[in-house]
Every structure is written in C-alpha cells, then in structure tokens.
Design a protein with these regions (language model features):
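Catalytic His-Asp segment of secreted/periplasmic serine-dependent ester chemistry enzymes
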Residues: 201-300
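Conserved N-terminal glycine/acidic-rich loop preference
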Residues: 129-131, 152-188, 197-246
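Secretory targeting and sorting signals
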Residues: 1-37
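Charged, often glycine-rich, active-site loop that binds/positions anionic groups
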Residues: 94-116, 258-273
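Structural recognition of the beta-strand scaffold that forms the well-ordered cores
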Residues: 44-49, 53-54, 85-90, 127-132, ...
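Short amphipathic alpha-helices and their capping/turn segments at secondary-structure boundaries
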Residues: 32-44, 80, 113-130, 135, ...
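Serine-esterase "nucleophile elbow" of acetyl-processing enzymes
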Residues: 36-94, 148-154
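Oxyanion-hole/transition-state-stabilizing segment in secreted/luminal serine hydrolases
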Residues: 56-58, 109-171, 203
Length: 300
C-alpha cells in the first residue's frame, strides 16, 4: 500500500500495523495458505489482484506481510461460501505487470523481499479465477492522496489533472485498457477451463463528498469517484471482450461509502474507523463483495 503524507493517515496505518505485529497476526512468510491444497472434488480457485482484493490491515494477515493478504478478504470469504480450494496470491501494490513479473515488496519504506508472479498460481485444471486490478496501473490511490485539503477555498486538485485541457487520468485509464485485455487472454491460456470473474472497484465517496469528514472538496470528491467509475467502465468493456464476467461493486455500495457511519461503511476513508487500510475496503466490505460474487456465480 502506498501511503500518503497526510499525518493522520500515516499515524493510523502505523498504529494498526504495529498492533498486528505485536499480536502475532502479521505473518511474514511467502507461503500460499494451507487452504490452497487441492482437495478431491473441490472447486480449484485462484484469487489474483491488488490491495482492494487482498484486504490490507484486516486481521488476520497471511502470507507476506507487505501484501496485506487478509484471511477475511473477499477471496477467503468466497472460498468458504463455495467450499472451494483457494490459492490466494493477491498483493497490495500489484499492477497488471505483476501477473507475469515478480513484485518488489516494502512496508513503510522498509524492503521486504518480493512476491512471485501471480500467474504462477494458475493451473490447467483451475476452475475459478477472480481478478481485481487497475488501481495501481492508473495511480488512482496516489491521486486521491494528493487531493486532501482542510482549506475550503483551496484550488481543486481536479484542475491539476486537467492542465492545458489534457485529461491525465483519462489517458492513464485508456492506457490500462489493453493491458487488462492481455491479462485476461493470458488467464484463459493458462487455465482454459476456468470461469474468470473480474470485479470493478467500489463506491469510495458519495456525490459531493462529505468535507471535512473526508478532506476532499466536493468537486474533487466527484472527480475522484468519477475516475473510479470511468475505470470500472473500461474493466467491464475489457471483460466482455475477453471472455470474462464483470462484477459491479460500485452500484450495490450506495449508502456504504466512506462518508457513512462506521457500522455502515464498506470502505474506509483517509483515517480509518476500523482495522483496514485507508481508502480500502474493511471487513464488512470484503464480506459483502464476496456475497455479491457468490450470488452471481450461483445465479448464472
């Protein structure tokens, strides 16, 4: 997870990471969880993706600690629902290139080795693959980190990303589209019988935002969520074009964004109110994402 410089943001992450380490919940091994062992008759399920899928800082952590892979992320919750045999290789900071390249890992700027290419988990007999990717290719979390302000009269950061009439975020999203297509084609090549499920990203902030609770101006709240929505559209289009099934997580997330009460939120804001990374799903969110994916699988 790339951390912003917002003091409250960094302090909250360091506190949670320290608590996990002290209680022994942060396991710094590179092993695939024991649940990955193939069982006779069980659906063979591989989970690929970035921190939205890995569930950083949601206890308990399994695998490389810098990947932030939670035993309560949507993959683990879904595998439990399906009775599937899971290989979860999701990892915070992963981009599309890390499907076929190893990923250098660090936490709070401390090097922590590397994670193997995520595609190493795929097998010819894999039955189900889930994928959540794109946020790091397009840098959307980094953009959100740079849009915070406690000054209601500040210049909207939206202007910075549209200087000279150039839609910088739109360019990044457009550049990501063919990369996703290649990833999906490669999954089919490696696991030709697998059902491939691709999720979009959720609803992070409601229209107009909730400044100063979440310290982004109303126009920037709409700019940020609008960028997520545009990327979701690209993910849906590429999924349809490359034989994958798209799961919309944003629409069902209405009323569960970072502006809501702690018990209602599926995603955390800049300073979390639950054990989860800033600007990422909490356990409630991961469980609901698993329910949405499970309902899709069982209904079609």
């Amino acid at each position: 997870v790339n951390l912003p410089q917002h003091k409250g943001f960094c302090r909250s992450v360091r506190t949670i990471v320290g608590a996990l380490a002290l209680t022994g919940l942060a396991v710094g091994t590179g092993a695939v969880p024991a649940s990955a062992a193939t069982e006779d008759g069980a659906t063979s399920y591989v989970a690929l993706g970035d921190s939205m899928a890995s569930g950083p800082l949601i206890p308990d952590i399994t695998g490389p600690v810098a990947c932030g892979r939670s035993t309560h992320n949507y993959a683990h919750e879904l595998a439990s629902r399906l009775g599937a045999s899971l290989r979860d290789v999701t990892c915070s900071g992963a981009a599309s290139k890390h499907m076929t390249e190893k990923q250098s890992l660090s936490l709070l700027d401390i090097p922590m080795g590397s994670a193997p290419p995520q595609f190493d988990a795929l097998r010819p007999d894999t039955d189900l693959v889930t994928l959540t990717i794109g946020g790091n290719d397009t840098g959307l979390v980094g953009i959100a980190q740079k849009c915070t302000t406690l000054d209601p009269n500040a210049t909207p950061c939206k202007e910075k990303y549209n200087e000279g009439g150039v839609d910088q975020v739109g360019q990044r999203i457009a550049e990501f589209a063919p990369k996703l297509g290649v990833v999906l084609d490669s999954i089919h090549q490696r696991s030709p019988h697998a059902r491939v499920i691709v999720t979009g990203y959720g609803l992070y902030i409601k229209p107009g935002g909730c400044w100063p609770l979440q310290p982004v101006l109303p126009v920037d709240a709409d700019f940020l969520q609008g960028s997520v929505d545009r990327m979701n559209t690209v993910i849906a289009e590429q999924s349809a074009a490359h034989g994958a099934e798209y799961i919309d997580l944003a629409t069902p997330s209405k009323g569960h964004d970072s502006c809501q009460a702690p018990s209602d939120k599926w995603v955390e804001g800049y300073v979390p109110t639950a054990a989860a990374a800033p600007l990422h799903p909490n356990r409630n969110g991961e469980e609901n994402y698993a329910a949405l994916i499970g309902a899709h699988l069982q209904g079609s």
